[in-house]
């Protein structure tokens, strides 16, 4: 566990495309009998000092078996980057403030502890401000680790009208190429061979896949 790190879990997704699960919110969707929120928070809690969940205003959240701190989006529907900004603003009030923040969307039920540890290690390297996985040629900012002192850059990017995490990463890399450390699939496979950590759930078909994987894991397959 890194005492200088927190986790920020955006959990405001409405799950509109998840068929029968729609309306309950992604945090409450279940996989293998456990909610997505529980699966994600119980994993990241073992690697950081605090878990901060950023939820939609007025919405309810399922309980988690680990200690979490719940805050509400300051701008409902503004997207995950705004939620992450809110989480960072909340986190830096602590004394001393954290150095690193694990970003992990609540719809990644198979996030592996080894992936979190690898990203924390890479983000702690000199000169690095964001450890950003890349899978199949696509950056994966919703499971990444960034330096908390990126908050001013995030605020400026949002103020300019930016909302994309990938756009933010590109902006930071343009100004300081070595600040964004890409963690490629080969390196990620050393701690998560099937790369299931990056299997997100947006559709009923996605949910059916993760349910099958969860069942296979319970059987030891």
Predicted regions and their residues:
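Hydrophobic helical membrane-anchoring modules
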Residues: 207-221
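Long, charged alpha-helical interface segments
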Residues: 201-202
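Nucleotide and nucleotide-moiety/phosphate-recognizing core
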Residues: 2-162, 167-197, 212-215
């Amino acid at each position: 566990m890194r005492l200088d790190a927190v986790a920020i879990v955006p959990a405001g997704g409405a799950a509109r495309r998840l068929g029968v699960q729609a309306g309950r919110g992604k945090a409450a969707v279940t996989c293998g009998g456990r909610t997505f929120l529980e699966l994600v928070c119980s994993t990241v809690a073992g690697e950081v000092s605090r878990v901060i969940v950023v939820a939609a205003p007025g919405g309810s959240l399922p309980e988690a078996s680990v200690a979490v701190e719940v805050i509400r989006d300051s701008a409902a529907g503004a997207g995950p980057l705004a939620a992450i900004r809110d989480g960072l603003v909340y986190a830096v009030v602590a004394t001393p403030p954290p150095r690193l923040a694990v970003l992990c969307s609540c719809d990644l039920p198979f996030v592996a502890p080894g992936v979190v540890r690898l990203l924390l290690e890479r983000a702690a390297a000199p000169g690095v401000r964001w450890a950003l996985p890349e899978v199949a040629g696509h950056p994966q900012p919703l499971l990444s680790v960034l330096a908390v002192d990126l908050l001013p850059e995030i605020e400026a990017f949002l103020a300019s009208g930016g909302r994309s995490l990938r756009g933010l990463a590109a902006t930071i890399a343009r100004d300081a190429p070595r600040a964004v450390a890409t963690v490629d699939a080969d390196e990620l496979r050393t701690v998560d061979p099937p790369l299931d950590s990056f299997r997100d759930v947006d559709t009923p078909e996605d949910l059916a896949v993760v349910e099958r994987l969860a069942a296979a894991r319970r059987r030891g397959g």
